[in-house]
Amino acid sequence: PWTKVIPAIGLSPRDCALIEPMSVGFHAVSRAQVTDNDTVMVIGCGMIGLGAVVRAALRGADVIAVDVDDEKLALAARLGATHGINSKTEDVHARLMELTGGSGPDVVIEAVGSPVTYVMAVDEVAFTGRVVCIGYAKNEVAFQTKYFVQKELNICGSRNALPADFRGVINLLKKGNFPTDR
C-alpha cells in the first residue's frame, strides 16, 4: 500500500536501484548490534555487503571486508572498510589473526550465501561473537556444532530491512557520500 512508500525525491533512478540492497546490509548491522567497540568482518562486497560495510563504519566499527575481487575490496575501502582481504589470494584466517590480535572479529556478516562462507563465518568469529547470515546457501551447510557451544556464539539471520534502514540509505545517497558511479 501507499503507506509503505518512502519518498526518494531528488535521487536518480540509478541511486534508487541501490536503496533496497544497501538497506538489507544496513539492517544486518542493526541485527548484529554493532557498536564502535566492534571489529566487523563482512564476507562479500556486493551491494548488500557494501551496505553492511557502510553502516558498520558509520557506527564507528573497525571493518574488515572479505571478497575475491580486488575492485570490490577497493570500493569497500572507499566506503569505510579499514582492511580488505582477498580470500582468493590471501590466507583469511592468518590475516584476521594478525588484524585482531589473535581473537577474531567480534561480528561476522555473511553476505555471499555459500556453504564455504557460512562455515568461515562461524570458524573466524571471536569467542562470544555474533554472526548474521544474509546470503541464502543453495546447498546444505555442514557445521561442527561444537563451535556454536564452545565459542558461545549468537547466530541469526537477516533477510530484509525496516523503514528506518531505507531512510538511512536514502539520506546517505542524498548527501552524495556513496559513489554510485561504481
Task: State where each predicted segment sits.
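Glycine-centered, small-residue-biased loops immediately flanking beta-strands
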Residues: 38, 129-130
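Glycine-rich phosphate/adenylate-binding loop and adjacent beta-alpha elements
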Residues: 1-6
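N-terminal Rossmann-like NAD(P) cofactor-binding module of classical short-chain dehydrogenase/reductase
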Residues: 109, 132
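A glycine-rich helix->loop->beta "capping" turn
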Residues: 99-107
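Helix-to-beta-strand junctions that scaffold the AdoMet/dcAdoMet cofactor pocket
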Residues: 125-127
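Mid-domain Rossmann-like dinucleotide-binding core that forms the NAD(H)/NADP(H) cofactor-binding site
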Residues: 11-90
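Local beta-strand N-terminus motif with an aromatic residue
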Residues: 81, 104-105, 180
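C-terminal substrate-binding/catalytic core of Rossmann-like NAD(P)-dependent dehydrogenases/reductases
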Residues: 93-98, 138-182
